Amino acid sequence: MRELTKKEIEILQRHAKWLKNEEGGERADLRGADLRGADLQDANLRDANIRGSNLRGANLRGAYLRGSDLQGAAGKILSFGSIGSRQEIAYVTKTEQIIHIRCGCFYGTLKEFTAKVEEEHGDSQYGKFYKAAIEFIKAHDAACWQDDAEE
C-alpha cells in the first residue's frame, strides 16, 4: 500500500473543508488521478470527482463515496441502489480479496452484511431485497473481480 503524496493529502484536506463549508475548502478533483495502491482508508470522498481515476489496489476500506463521480474509474468499486428499508445507495469495494459494503449506517464485510440482513430482516420484503443485492454482489465479484492477473 502506498502512502498518499503531499498533493493528494492537500486535495483531501481542502475537500474536507469544502464538505464543512469552511474557508479554503474546495471540492476534490481527482479526475484521471493515478491512485493505484493508495491508502484511502476511511477517506471522506463524498461528492468528489474521481472520474477516470485508477483505483486498482487502492485501500477503500471505510471510504465514504456517496455522490462521488466514479465514471470510468478503474478499480474494484460498485455502487447501486436505492435498496432496502432506508432506500440507501450501497457502495461495495474489494480490497485484499475481502468485499466491504457501506449501506446506510452499516459498514462491514459481505459476510457481516449477510448476517445482519438475516438478523434484522429475515424473509421480510426488505430481507428479500437485501438478499437479492447480496446475490448481485456475489455474481459481480465472480464475473468482474476474480481475475486479478488482468489488472
Each predicted region: which residue ranges?
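Extended, small-residue-rich solenoid/repeat segments and analogous flexible loops
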Residues: M1-R56, A139-E151
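Residue-level marker of intrinsically disordered, low-complexity segments enriched
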Residues: R2, K7-I9, A48, G75, ...
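A general boundary/transition motif marking the beginning of the first structured unit of a protein
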Residues: E3-L4, I101, C105, Q125
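Intrinsically disordered, low-complexity regions enriched in Ser/Thr/Pro/Gly and simple repeats
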Residues: K17, E26, Y107, K111, ...
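Glycine-rich hexapeptide-repeat left-handed beta-helix
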Residues: L60, L65-L110, A115
